[in-house]
């Protein structure tokens, strides 16, 4: 694939598996939802080759930021998702959100991203769709508030 990440067909399986495993061990599951801001405009004005290059760089930055046990997925178009097991929301923000924004800024000075973070509690049951939807909603809050930002429940 273009980005070297799993595609959306793997997402539901990854989240469901992570939730089941985490529930047995009383660990949290965190979803990070990432969107490349103004991607359509970039594609339309700078061309699809530039758009593909941006997607490859973002995919690479996501893989570099993730741990071995994390699932990195290209959700579609310019949207990505990382599923983290046993990673608290604050830790996800410090380790992933800030690092990812910084890495993308270093490689793509003219591109910004918006990130949403959602987490289940250690003993809380949430289905996969609800967790992803919440991370997506928080990504839109980050996008409206300030581009190149992340939104967690505590921010």
Regions found by a protein language model. Give the residues of each.
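Catalytic-core segments of nucleotide cyclases and related cyclic-nucleotide turnover enzymes
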Residues: 48, 97-101, 105, 120-155
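Short conserved AdoMet
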Residues: 67
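Short beta-strand-to-loop capping motifs
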Residues: 82-87, 119-120
